[in-house]
Amino acid sequence: ITFQGCSPARQTVITNAITRARADVRAAVSALPTKAPVSTFSTWFGVYND
């Protein structure tokens, strides 16, 4: 992922934050009692398409 006008250090921070957020989302999704909405959710956010 590249961000226009960001230093490499800032890009790393942003990328790491996104990675952590996606991991949190994965954990939340896997904790759901039903898997029915998961495919829609993951399609919207690309959660399972790294």
Curated annotation (Swiss-Prot):
It comes from the Eukaryota. Keywords: Antimicrobial, Fungicide, Hydrolase, Protein synthesis inhibitor, Toxin. It catalyses: Endohydrolysis of the N-glycosidic bond at one specific adenosine on the 28S rRNA. This is Ribosome-inactivating protein lyophyllin. The keyword Hydrolase applies. Its EC number is 3.2.2.22. The keyword Transcription does not apply. N-glycosylase that inhibits protein synthesis by depurinating ribosomal rRNA, and thus acts as a ribosomal inactivating protein (RIP). Has adenine polynucleotide glycosidase activity on the poly(A) substrate A30-ssDNA. Inhibits cell-free translation in rabbit reticulocyte lysate system with an IC(50) of 1 nM. May function in the defense response to pathogens. Displays antifungal activity against C.comatus and P.piricola, but not against R.solani, M.arachidicola and C.gossypii. Inhibits mycelial growth in P.piricola with an IC(50) of 2.5 uM. It comes from Lyophyllum shimeji (Hon-shimeji). GO terms for biological process: defense response to fungus; killing of cells of another organism; negative regulation of translation.
